[in-house]
Amino acid sequence: MKTRLFTIFLFIFSFSLVFAGGSKEADNSRNNEVVIYAYDSFCSEWGPGPAIVKAFEEKTGYKVTMISAGDAAQVLSKATFEKANPKSDVLIGIDNNLLDKAKSQNILESYKPQNADALIDSNLILDSEWFLSPFDWSSFAMIFDSYANVPAPTCLSDLTKDIYKKKIILMDPRTSTPGLGFVAWTLAEYGLDGIEDFWKALKPNILTMAPGWDTGYGLFTSGEAPLVISYTTSPAYHIYDGEDYRYVALEFEKGHPMQIEGAGLVKNAKNPEGGKAFLDFLISKEAQEIIPETQW
């Protein structure tokens, strides 16, 4: 598994994301404040973050500062840049494809939340050391706009056909976990011998490589292209929101790898006890009941 993930990062090509440092630390203690770095859609007004934070604050008395740091890979990069003087207590969104990179940067502290054995299915546990606590999961899928004037593809190789020229929206695998997940999907299907040829054939059909899911999916629903990488659960949002069945999660014969999103305690966090309390709450029934209707 580690070899495959290393290969994925090599395929993407080496890079360094540099973020400006966070706001000046006002107080070294801040015992009552929990600082969380999370990805854009988690923090948005329609995402689960605001409701989870509100419920946590009301239950525990902690004050939460939730900072949107881009997509999940950017959350990881920001925390890595600050690791000599961490400004966050909890990172949200580091997934199974980013776990090894996060561990190699030594930015996470092992912590197993209270009641984890009772609340978390053993199949979802990301690592035995509990550097990450799983809180959300779904399988990747291509989402298709059924109103489009092109037929729905039935497999990954179909995506390389001329009929889909400039009709596919993907996410940058350097900054986006869906983008990285799609690369992992193609590697699993084509292997090292075939992945380069697949991507060369796919390139003319890519409208854009968006920096994150939020931007990419927004372009898709704006009608910029009829295909986007997302999750099997994405169409349910539109139905829940009172829309019709326009958007369809395509079921291919192979693939659809699962993404398991985790949250972790930052190593040398300024408020580790507050961070632990938040992780305890994030896997609780109260928090988990918020996620299905806010995290699609």
Regions found by a protein language model. Name each.
Residues 1-34:
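Short, low-complexity disordered leader/linker segments with a strong preference
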Residues 141-148, 259-274, 290-291:
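A bilobed periplasmic-binding-protein/Venus flytrap-type ligand-binding module shared by bacterial periplasmic
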Residues 52, 155, 194-198, 270-282, ...:
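Short amphipathic alpha-helical coupling segments at ligand-binding clamshell hinges
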